A protein has these predicted regions:
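Short intrinsically disordered, low-complexity coil segments enriched in acidic
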Residues: 1-11, 36, 163-168, 172, ...
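Catalytic core of nucleotide-sugar-dependent glycosyltransferases
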Residues: 54, 70, 78-86, 91-119, ...
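Hydrophobic alpha-helical core bundles mediating ligand binding, dimerization, or RNAP-core interactions
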Residues: 59-62, 104, 132
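Structural motif
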Residues: 119-126, 167
Length: 179
């Protein structure tokens, strides 16, 4: 059963930055099985970006591959169908929330290292704030402590103090003292 179809790209080819902008802002939603790349690209770029549980690894990897190959193209035709085993993967499990938060922090650091020049753009900052809000509210369903929140805040603060304060202000009263 088809649940979601992404809107088409606005241009024939999008950069790694534009992919991240769309992904972080929630404009597109995709899974690893929707991306095709050559072994040569994989080898020449150093393979997959590694984060705990591979959480965020796919998005970082596709952005990296896109920057290496001058973009991602969308193939027209039938959408990809894939089986999402409800309650059988890490996305739906509270058991891995701590590792998801750690990986999210590493992903944010990766973005800071690879897209530093874009961090001044308000639309990129808005997308990053939206992304962190979705992680805290949906992916870990509010299952985070003040320590977790301040860890993300410290990482975001290095990217943009304003961005960090926006996230902190939205979640400080929702954080648990302990889990």
């Amino acid at each position: 059963k088809l649940k979601y179809i992404n809107p088409p790209f606005e241009t024939e080819r999008i950069s790694g930055y534009d992919f991240l902008l769309d992904k972080l802002s929630g404009k597109i939603s995709s899974a690893a099985c929707e991306y095709v790349f050559t072994r040569d690209v994989w080898k020449k770029t150093g393979g997959f970006v590694r984060f705990p549980l591979a959480w965020c690894s796919d998005d970082a990897t596709w952005a990296k591959f896109a920057d290496y190959t001058a973009g991602i193209i969308s193939l027209p035709g039938t959408p990809v169908y894939w089986r999402n085993a409800e309650n059988k993967n890490i996305s739906n499990s509270m058991r891995f929330d701590g590792e998801k938060l750690k990986a999210t922090g590493l992903f944010l650091k990766w973005i800071g290292m690879n897209y530093r020049l874009n961090l001044r753009e308000s639309r990129f900052q808005d997308a990053l704030v939206t992304y962190v809000n979705v992680i805290l509210e949906c992916s870990v369903r509010g299952n985070y402590t003040l320590k977790d929140l301040f860890s993300l805040y410290a990482i975001l603060r290095k990217l943009s103090p304003t961005m960090a304060l926006r996230v902190l202000r939205s979640h400080i009263l929702k954080a648990k003292l302990f889990i």
